[in-house]
Each structure stands twice: as C-alpha cells, then as structure tokens.
C-alpha cells in the first residue's frame, strides 16, 4: 500500500501574504508520535527501568499524553511546513503563523486521524512600475558660495583655539560654560530621563540643547543659579518629551573662552600641514567644491529615486519593513562596538524600542526604493555580468590579502554585484529622465544642511543613540570624579 502524501493548498492573501492549508495523513501523525516517544525514552530516567528500556505505557503515564502529543505536534508542523515550501517552491519572508493557534490544534490532535491546519506567511511582493522612462523631476540648482571657505577657516580656528578661564564677566555666546542642571516636567514634577548632570562642558552656541537653554545661561556669572522654564520641541528625539513643558535648575560652575589663533602661515602649517595660508585656502576651496558637486549629484539622484518609487505598485508586507528596521539597529550597534563602546549597556530595551519607532519611516522608504530599483532592473533587463564583478573584485585584492580576519568571498561578491547593479540603474535613470534645474542663491552652510537632510543615511535613531552614548560618557566622567 502506497504511503499517503501531504496535501498542500495555497491561497494568496492581501499585503503579499500567502495561506497554506495542509492536510497531514494519519500515518504520518502516528509515526511522528512513536518517534517522539522513542526519542524521549532514550533519555528519560524512571526508577526501576534501564535507560532506553522504558515501556511505552509507563512512559506515557509518567510524561503525560498531552505533553507527548505537544512534542510530536511541533515536529509535525515543522516538517510539513518545510515539505510544503519545497512542493510549492515558495521562499517565505517570515516565520509561519498558525491560524487557529497551537493549543486549539493540540486539543483536536489524534495520531489515529489525519490532521488539518492552516499556516500563513509573508512572501516577496509582485512588482510593477507604472512608468520607467521619461520621468521628470525639478531640483534647486545652488551655486557654490566662496564665503564657505572663510566659514571653514573660522571653524578650524575654533578647533585650534586655546581655552582660557574667564572670571571677570558674565557668560556670552561662544563661551564654554561648565554647568550643573536638573530637569523635571512641569505638569507632573517627574524628573526628566537624562535631564540631570553634575558637571557638563557646554559650548554656548545657538541650537545646542533644547530651545532657550543656551540663551538662559547667557549673562549668568560663575556661582549663579537660575530657573529656566522651557518647552521640548514637537520633533524631539525622545517621544515621551515631545511638546512638554519643563523646568531646569541650572548653576554656572565655571566659565572659559576660546583664544583664536591668528590666520597666517603659521596657522596653515599647524592646522593643515600647508606652507602658507594661501595654499591652505586653496586646498579647503578644492575640498568644498568637490563636496558641493557631490551633494548636487546626490540631490539629483534622490529626486530621481523618489520619482521612480512613486511609480511602484506593490503590496509590501510588514515583515520586510521589520527586517529593514532590525538591520538598521544592528548596523548602528556594530558601529558603536567598533568605537569601543559598551553596546549592551547603551542599547537598553527602551532605546531599542525608541530606535525601532524612529527608524521605521526611513526603513519603509528604503524598502520601497530597493523594490522600485528591482522592478526597474526586471522591466528594462538591466543586469551585471560576471566579468564586471571580477574586475571590481580586483580593487579588494590587497585588502583581502592583508586582512587578519577571514573574508566571506561569497558575501563580498553579492555586495559588489548589488552595488554595481545600483550604479547601472541610476545611470539608466539619469539617461532616460528629464531633470529641470531651478537656480537659487544660498549659503554653503544652508546647502550643506539641505544636502544632509536629503542624502544622509544617519537616521534620527542614530542621533538618539549618539546622544545616549554622550550621556553615558558624561555619567562615567562624573563617577570617576
């Protein structure tokens, strides 16, 4: 008599989910229960019986039939799920969800009868582009501002400044104030998490801390204590504080100022290893222009990718966004670990939750873009050839040979292939789209800010994590003192 086969019926569901209706033959159920009993028997210890020689009925009486059936059922679900995926040639994106629940299925399970149950999972969405050629975008064409060179020089002067104590005047913008502060919410009186410090060096510059904090310290003298009534911004990184009013008790413990070096040839040698100030300015201008041109190109690419994404038709499953969020958090943690920071103490459950929430919009955008590019590659038959990958691999030969760590060549090849494909797709977009430029005047500083908002991969989550790390460092300094 032929062995009964697993029966599999699939039904597509909204949001790129698929339902698997499985029917397990009674013979399979009975075999799995017997195998479970045999496995447990080999390791179970019952007084009066040798190991592996416990009678079936004694084992059932000792372990309990429900527990044995539960163990067998877990194996049945797992094995049938793997077999169903092979039968239907489907690659799931998420773990299967048992529709009726495990306890309900266990209650009706019998080794003598066939078993029916339904599993659901996410799968890769079907992709369609309404349009790929002839996309039209408009970007602001800003001109390079020569004043940015002077701004960069001033920042460099500030970095190489001598810090000297101030005793005979009040605090002003540009000073370095050593402050202690304690913050609480105005409505509840509850202390603000991370809103307390016994000693912190704070550069008195606008846009540092929350609005009004720096301005409140200006005109204070050493030894002064002041109460600041402030309000957290609506877009503050910590969701619990957004829009809330707060009271800060601030004391000015010490005051310092920066003594800026003169802009001359000596400064050029000290700050940029250049022979003259003229040479230093020329070098700074070259770097700024290169960065400016790259920023302009990035802005154009961002606009084209947004336009392409708007043409995408796809039901994106939640699990794809979840995976992207998790990957972003893991990458952030890896960067922190590479900097020698204690990831376990920094990435608390509260922070991970905050990161998950704050990175989600960007993660969703990343997934949409990647799918739009994938759809473009399929529609226009854009691929990467093996010789292109091999040629690019040569750039990594020295790094691979000199690395003390084992390099996963297969993974590296996949990364190179993805990067090359993305480059090809972006070039194709540039060649087959219309980009209109609108000339505007803006300072280099505002252009840099805009570029960062448009092109940076650093999310609010990373900023939140960075702030947490700084707070941790400050706390560690206090403890050492």
UniProtKB/Swiss-Prot annotation:
Domain PPIase FKBP-type: 174-261
Region (Disordered): 435-481
Catalytic reaction list: [protein]-peptidylproline (omega=180) = [protein]-peptidylproline (omega=0)
Subcellular localization: Cytoplasm
Broad class of where this protein is predominantly found: cytoplasm
UniProt function note: Involved in protein export. Acts as a chaperone by maintaining the newly synthesized protein in an open conformation. Functions as a peptidyl-prolyl cis-trans isomerase.
Protein name: Trigger factor
Organism classification: Bacteria, Bacillati, Cyanobacteriota, Cyanophyceae, Synechococcales
Gene this chain is encoded by: tig
């Amino acid at each position: 008599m032929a062995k009964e086969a697993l029966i599999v019926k699939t039904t597509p569901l909204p949001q790129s989910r698929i339902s698997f209706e499985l029917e397990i033959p009674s013979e399979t159920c009975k075999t799995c229960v017997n195998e479970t009993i045999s496995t447990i028997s080999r390791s179970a210890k019952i007084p009066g019986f040798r190991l592996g020689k416990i009678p079936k009925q004694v084992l059932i009486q000792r372990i309990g039939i429900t527990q044995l059936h539960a163990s067998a059922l877990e194996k049945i679900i797992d094995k049938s799920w793997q077999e169903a995926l092979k039968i239907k040639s489907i690659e799931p994106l998420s773990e299967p969800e048992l529709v009726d629940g495990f306890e309900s299925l266990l209650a009706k399970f019998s080794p003598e009868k066939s078993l029916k149950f339904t599993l659901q999972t996410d799968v890769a969405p079907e992709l369609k582009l309404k349009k790929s050629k002839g996309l039209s975008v408009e970007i602001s064409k800003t001109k390079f501002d020569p004043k940015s060179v002077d701004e960069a020089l001033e920042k460099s002067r500030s970095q190489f400044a001598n810090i000297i104590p101030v005793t005979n005047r009040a605090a002003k913008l540009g000073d370095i104030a050593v402050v202690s502060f304690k913050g609480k919410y105005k409505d509840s009186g509850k202390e603000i998490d991370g809103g307390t410090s016994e000693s912190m060096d704070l550069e008195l510059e606008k846009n540092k801390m929350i609005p009004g904090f720096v301005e409140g310290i200006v005109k204070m003298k050493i030894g002064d204590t002041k109460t600041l009534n402030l309000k957290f911004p609506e877009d503050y990184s910590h969701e619990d504080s957004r829009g809330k009013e707060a009271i800060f008790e601030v004391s000015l413990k010490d005051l310092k100022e920066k003594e800026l070096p003169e802009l001359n040839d000596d400064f050029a040698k000290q700050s940029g290893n250049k022979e003259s100030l003229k040479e230093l300015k020329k070098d700074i201008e070259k770097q700024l222009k290169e960065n400016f041109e790259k920023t302009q190109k990035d802005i154009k690419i961002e606009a084209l990718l947004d336009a392409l994404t708007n043409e995408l038709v796809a039901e994106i499953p939640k699990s794809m966004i979840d995976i992207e969020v998790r990957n972003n958090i893991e990458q952030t943690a890896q960067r922190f670990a590479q900097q020698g920071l204690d990831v376990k103490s920094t990435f608390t459950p509260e922070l991970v939750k905050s990161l998950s929430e704050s990175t989600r919009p960007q993660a969703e955008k990343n997934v949409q873009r990647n799918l739009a590019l994938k759809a473009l590659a399929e529609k226009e038959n854009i691929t990467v050839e093996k010789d292109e990958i091999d040629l690019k691999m040569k750039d990594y030969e020295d790094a691979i040979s000199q690395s003390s760590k084992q390099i996963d060549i297969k993974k590296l090849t996949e990364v190179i292939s993805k990067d090359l494909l993305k480059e090809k797709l972006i070039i194709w977009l540039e060649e087959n789209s219309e980009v209109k430029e609108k000339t505007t005047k803006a300072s280099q500083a505002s252009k840099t800010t805009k570029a960062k908002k448009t092109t940076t991969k650093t999310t609010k989550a990373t900023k939140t994590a960075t702030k947490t790390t700084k707070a941790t460092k400050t706390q560690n300094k206090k403890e050492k003192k």
